[in-house]
């Protein structure tokens, strides 16, 4: 239950963000304000939002339950934060103004899931995750955190604190929608939006205080409080104004408990890529790369938290099945209309309460299943209730910046470019491209100068550079494939013996080696080592 309450916010946040793309609703190309005042289009978008509530809860329930049943891990999965924003605001674009239509974007997600599955089976997934420099991997999470923060501060899916400007790319906003002029706020009306202040104090300050005192479900408490304040109709902060759109939303909200079938986003994929090949490829590669890093990093950290990491291979039991469940869930989610799913760090809430097995995930999945029938509630959560949630999630993601190697410019500059370009271009892909290319360029120049000068031109602090290698401890191929190559008939089963003959030989001290017992400096008595059993 702790895991569910820690991440239940994803149902409303993901539906709010994804529906801003417009889904498969059609906005006329000549519409002057991108259909922001088109009632028929906005009612269609509201239907997309309701579909997304059902789809998000359903795919989270399915993926999380099978993560526990098949992989026996206490990890929950749901549509990933960051990837859903990239999907909605860059790939599809606000109200469909992006690179490719919604239906083709779903096709990219569907294909990415199956490719991810193939990479997992062949062991390439692990290699790709480790082949990227550590600074770029850490910077990716930080950049996505700032990206989410910017979305949470904007109008479309946030509190409306910032907006576009004429003389600068962005400026302070905070006026009501009725007072906005061409997307900008007049100077006399800034910071006067009541919904913004409700979102800041009840959804931001209160939630941060609850998190400060480790209150379980702090995020969902803040979201629900702002929503409850915004539900009464005759108020300045109501989410249900007396308009045709507001009346339709209020009528659905009054049902409270009902099953809303997925109508518009189910099986909405389009396989005709004519005219969209390059954009499709960029979206596909970005989804795949971010999903590999996100899922690998989260599963690794949760497994380490649960104490199941093998220090030699840096892998954990059930890893292959966990990645396969995640990959298949990505493709199933595309059939329902959702962005790619990923493992959630909020799973740590359940682990900290004692959850160490898949039973924790099974219970969390069942809770998401129950949430499917509360679609009217989750579909009626306003964007200013979730805006500060995005800011807080961004803050949590940015703590990885402390682990970046800022001492060596060959690591620091590419990491900074990755972080900065993601929010400034509203694109995860462009940030990754800038970071990877700059890393290759800088370190290639250093290598050429060092080789050409025969070791005389070397950066003074090159010894502080993060180590990098394409080799993987434990071998390139996954354990199940190695067992198959060895001729093991039940290759899908883990080896029973803890140490193989080769591993034991590697663990024995060799001639000329000095073995230092680290327990000398500890307070614990030294235990005698067990002798190796004779053959």
Range-by-range predicted roles:
Residues 64-75, 209-214, 286-294, 327-336, ...:
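Transmembrane alpha-helix interface/packing and boundary motifs in multi-pass membrane proteins
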Residues 93-225, 362-496:
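Membrane-embedded alpha-helical modules
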Residues 19, 72-76, 124-125, 159, ...:
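Transmembrane helix-loop junctions in multipass membrane proteins, especially transporters and channels
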Residues 75-77, 218, 295, 338, ...:
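Conformational gate/switch positions in structured elements
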């Amino acid at each position: 239950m702790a895991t569910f309450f820690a991440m239940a916010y994803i149902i409303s946040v993901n539906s709010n963000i994804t529906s801003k793309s417009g889904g498969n609703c059609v906005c006329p190309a000549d519409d002057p304000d991108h259909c922001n005042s088109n009632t028929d289009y906005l009612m269609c978008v509201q239907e997309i939002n309701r579909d997304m509530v059902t789809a998000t809860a359903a795919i989270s329930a399915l993926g999380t339950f099978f993560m526990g049943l098949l992989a026996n891990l206490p990890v929950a999965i749901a549509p990933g934060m960051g990837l859903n924003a990239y999907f909605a605001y860059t790939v599809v674009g606000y109200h469909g103004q992006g690179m490719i239509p919604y239906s083709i974007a779903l096709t990219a997600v569907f294909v990415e899931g199956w490719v991810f599955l193939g990479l997992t089976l062949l062991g390439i997934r692990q290699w790709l995750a480790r082949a990227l420099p550590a600074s770029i991997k850490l910077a990716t999470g930080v950049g996505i955190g700032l990206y989410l923060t910017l979305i949470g501060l904007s109008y479309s899916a946030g509190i409306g604190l910032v907006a576009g400007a004429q003389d600068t790319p962005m400026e302070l906003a905070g006026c009501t929608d009725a007072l906005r002029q061409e997307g900008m706020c007049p100077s006399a009306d800034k910071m006067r939006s009541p919904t913004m202040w409700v979102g800041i104090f009840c959804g931001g300050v209160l939630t941060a205080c609850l998190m400060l005192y480790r209150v379980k479900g702090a995020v969902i408490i803040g979201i629900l409080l702002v929503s409850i304040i915004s539900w009464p109709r005759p108020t300045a902060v109501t989410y249900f104004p007396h308009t045709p759109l507001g009346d339709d939303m209020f009528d659905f909200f009054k049902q409270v408990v009902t099953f809303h079938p997925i109508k518009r986003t189910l099986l909405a994929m389009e396989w005709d890529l004519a005219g969209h090949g390059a954009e499709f490829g960029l979206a596909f590669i970005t989804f795949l790369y971010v999903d590999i890093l996100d899922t690998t990093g989260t599963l690794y950290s949760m497994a380490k938290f649960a104490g199941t990491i093998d220090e030699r291979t840096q892998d954990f039991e059930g890893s292959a099945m966990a990645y396969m469940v995640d990959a298949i869930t990505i493709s199933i989610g595309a059939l329902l209309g959702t962005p790619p799913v990923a493992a959630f760090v909020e799973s740590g809430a359940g682990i900290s309460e004692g959850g160490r097995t898949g039973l924790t995930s099974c219970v969390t999945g069942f809770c998401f299943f129950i949430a499917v029938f509360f679609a009217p509630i989750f579909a009626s959560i306003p964007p200013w209730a979730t805006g500060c949630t995005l800011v807080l999630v961004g803050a949590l993601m940015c703590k990885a910046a402390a682990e970046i190697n800022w001492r060596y410019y060959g690591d620091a500059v590419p990491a900074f470019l990755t972080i900065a370009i993601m929010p400034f271009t509203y694109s995860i892909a462009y940030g990754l491209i800038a970071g990877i290319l700059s890393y290759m360029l800088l370190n290639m120049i250093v290598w050429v100068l060092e080789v050409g000068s025969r070791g005389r031109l070397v950066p003074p602090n090159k010894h502080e550079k993060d180590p990098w290698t394409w080799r993987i401890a434990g071998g390139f191929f996954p354990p199940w494939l190695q067992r198959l190559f060895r001729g093991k008939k039940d290759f899908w089963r883990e080896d029973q013996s803890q140490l193989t003959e080769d591993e034991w030989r590697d663990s024995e001290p060799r001639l000329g080696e000095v073995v230092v017992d680290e327990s000398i400096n500890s307070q614990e008595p030294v235990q005698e080592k067990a002798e190796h059993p004779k053959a």
